[in-house]
Swiss-Prot record:
<dbReference type="InterPro" id="IPR036188">
    <property type="entry name" value="FAD/NAD-bd_sf"/>
</dbReference>
<comment type="similarity">
    <text>Belongs to the DadA oxidoreductase family.</text>
</comment>
<keyword id="KW-0274">FAD</keyword>
<feature type="binding site">
    <location>
        <begin position="4"/>
        <end position="18"/>
    </location>
    <ligand>
        <name>FAD</name>
    </ligand>
</feature>
<protein>
    <recommendedName>
        <fullName>Uncharacterized oxidoreductase YurR</fullName>
        <ecNumber>1.-.-.-</ecNumber>
    </recommendedName>
</protein>
<keyword id="KW-0285">Flavoprotein</keyword>
<dbReference type="Pfam" id="PF01266">
    <property type="entry name" value="DAO"/>
</dbReference>
<dbReference type="GO" id="GO:0016491">
    <property type="term" value="F:oxidoreductase activity"/>
</dbReference>
<dbReference type="GO" id="GO:0005737">
    <property type="term" value="C:cytoplasm"/>
</dbReference>
<keyword id="KW-0560">Oxidoreductase</keyword>
<dbReference type="InterPro" id="IPR006076">
    <property type="entry name" value="FAD-dep_OxRdtase"/>
</dbReference>
């Protein structure tokens, strides 16, 4: 039985651990629970089909990620994980400019040709749109995508790790440094113990370079600070409201029990130690959210989460074996799409590590692209 160590238990590491453990491999996950982990802060929107990004390699990952959720949730439920944080509630992409919605609708139909999981595509009037999300401002028409979903990153990650543990995986809280000799990574050293492994997989997000640097590897991962606000409405049944995708770079989505989430900021100049909830960040999120959904004004602001989204060069994720080092794999750079791509990419990474055929050609995502 082969043994694998995963360093970093965000959505990507948790998914990789689960899919490796399902094969009977011996899996150890090590994570120091760093404040600011992207998955822990994230509220995910699974609706990549309307994206205007032109990078086809990025889109193939996002499309595969959205498609994979149905199978993944079924697998997790069979493993006794009922609180996955995932719910297919649909999404409304809203706008006041009908011509913009025309183009969006056209894009959705084109994308549905090879992504039937998009579901129904429906053009909604302003009144129909507001009926689905009652706190919206008047005047927003929309394109409704029935196959879109929301994800609570914290809950999904917990489910994946719990299911992995049921399959024999061990999850350890602590620091991990790589053990390296004669060009081969042989395991890791934690605060208290050494662990040997056939391969080590680094899925440490914004902190990956810190782990790889002692090997003489400069891993080019940058990060963006995000502040995400949570609200509570006491008089609304929000559990089935769709995700709202406004014309701006923000989003609004709802969860059960009156919880509304709005965000997020995109801060490029913050350091990894800057976990502050700032006045400017709050102002940005609130002003953009209230412009779109003035009905949010009476909601209680209950929490602001801070996370650091990791990006690799060209804003394209990397996944695979680290060049010129035996026994070392890395995956990173999912940015703001972590909850769309992460579970699928973890499944693909597990196949790659095991020497099995992956669903996608992973060559465009070679980690060599992130090495200086």
């Amino acid at each position: 039985m082969k043994s694998y160590i995963i360093v970093g238990a965000g959505i990507l590491g948790a998914s990789t651990a689960y899919h490796l453990a399902k094969t009977g491999a011996r899996v150890t996950v090590i994570d120091r629970k760093e404040p600011g982990q992207a998955t822990d802060a994230a509220a995910g929107i699974v609706c990549p089909w309307l994206s205007q990004r032109r990078n086809q390699d990025w889109y193939q990952l996002a499309k595969g990620g959205a498609r994979y959720y149905k199978d993944l949730i079924h697998q997790l439920e069979k493993d006794g994980e009922s609180d996955t944080g995932y719910k297919r509630v649909g999404a409304i992409s809203i706008h006041t400019d009908a011509s913009k919605l025309d183009k969006m609708e056209e894009r959705a139909y084109k994308r549905r040709e090879d992504a039937p999981e998009i579901g129904d595509i429906t053009r909604l009037s302003a009144s129909e749109t507001k009926k689905l999300f009652p706190i919206l401002a008047d005047g927003y028409e929309s394109v409704h995508i029935s196959g879109a979903a929301r994800v609570n990153g914290r809950a999904l990650c917990r489910s994946l790790l719990s299911a992995a543990e049921k399959r024999g995986a061990t999850v350890i809280k602590g620091n991990a440094s790589l053990l390296f000799e004669n060009g081969t990574v042989t395991g890791v050293q934690t605060d208290t113990k050494q662990f040997a492994a056939d391969a080590v997989i680094v899925t440490a997000g914004a902190w990956a370079n810190e782990i790889l640097k002692p090997l003489g590897i400069h891993f080019q991962v940058s990060f963006q600070k995000a502040q995400i606000m949570h609200f509570e409405m006491t008089d609304a049944d929000t559990g089935s409201w769709p995700v709202v995708m406004p014309p701006s770079d923000q989003y609004i989505l709802s969860f059960d029990n009156g919880r509304i989430v709005a965000g997020a900021t995109h801060e490029n100049d913050a350091g990894l130690d800057d976990l502050r909830v700032t006045a400017g960040g709050q102002h940005e999120v609130l002003s953009k959210a209230l412009a779109v959904a003035p009905g949010l004004a009476d909601a209680a602001a209950v929490e602001t989460r801070v996370g650091f989204r990791p990006f690799t060069p060209g804003f394209l994720p990397v996944v695979g074996a680290v060049p010129n080092v035996q026994g070392l794999y890395a995956a990173n750079g999912l940015g703001a799409s972590g909850l769309t791509m992460g579970p699928f990419l973890g499944a693909e990474l597990a196949k790659l590590v095991l020497g099995k055929q992956t669903e996608l050609d992973l060559s465009p995502y070679d980690p060599a692209g992130a090495l200086a």
